[in-house]
């Protein structure tokens, strides 16, 4: 889970202003940060299937947002892939 301070910093860094939480780029940034923080937990606890379900939901949500960006704003999509070092 992402703390309020971390979320505020990420929104300020990737958003147009500090209240721009609805921007798809900002949402991808928040989800990517959350996913990266959860990866070590699943490496240490491979049988934690209950939490894995929520983890996979976050990955799917990020994938959906990336598909939206690819369709509607390809320039931001490519920037997103480069910034967060994602494969596509």
Swiss-Prot record:
Entry keywords, A to Z: Ribonucleoprotein, Ribosomal protein, RNA-binding, rRNA-binding
Entry-linked CDD domains: Ribosomal_S15p_S13e
SMART domains with a match to the protein in the record: Ribosomal_S15
Family annotation (Pfam families): Ribosomal_S15
Domain of life: Bacteria
One cellular-component annotation, GO: cytosolic small ribosomal subunit
Record GO terms (molecular function): rRNA binding; structural constituent of ribosome
Swiss-Prot/TrEMBL GO biological process terms: translation
InterPro entries xrefs: Ribosomal_uS15, Ribosomal_uS15_bac-type, uS15_NS1_RNA-bd_sf
PROSITE patterns documented for this protein: RIBOSOMAL_S15
NCBIfam families, per the entry: S15_bact
Function: One of the primary rRNA binding proteins, it binds directly to 16S rRNA where it helps nucleate assembly of the platform of the 30S subunit by binding and bridging several RNA helices of the 16S rRNA.
Quaternary organization: Part of the 30S ribosomal subunit. Forms a bridge to the 50S subunit in the 70S ribosome, contacting the 23S rRNA.
Record HAMAP family: Ribosomal_uS15_B (MF_01343_B)
Similarity-based family: Belongs to the universal ribosomal protein uS15 family.
Protein's name according to its UniProt entry: Small ribosomal subunit protein uS15
Source lineage: Bacteria, Bacillati, Mycoplasmatota, Mycoplasmoidales, Metamycoplasmataceae
């Amino acid at each position: 889970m992402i703390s309020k301070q971390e979320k505020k910093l990420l929104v300020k860094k990737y958003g147009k202003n500090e209240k721009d939480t609805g921007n798809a780029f900002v949402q991808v940034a928040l989800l990517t940060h959350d996913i990266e923080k959860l990866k070590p937990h699943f490496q240490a606890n491979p049988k934690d299937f209950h939490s894995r379900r929520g983890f996979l939901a976050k990955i799917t949500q990020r994938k959906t947002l990336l598909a939206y960006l690819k369709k509607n704003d390809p320039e931001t999509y490519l920037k997103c892939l480069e910034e967060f070092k994602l494969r596509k």
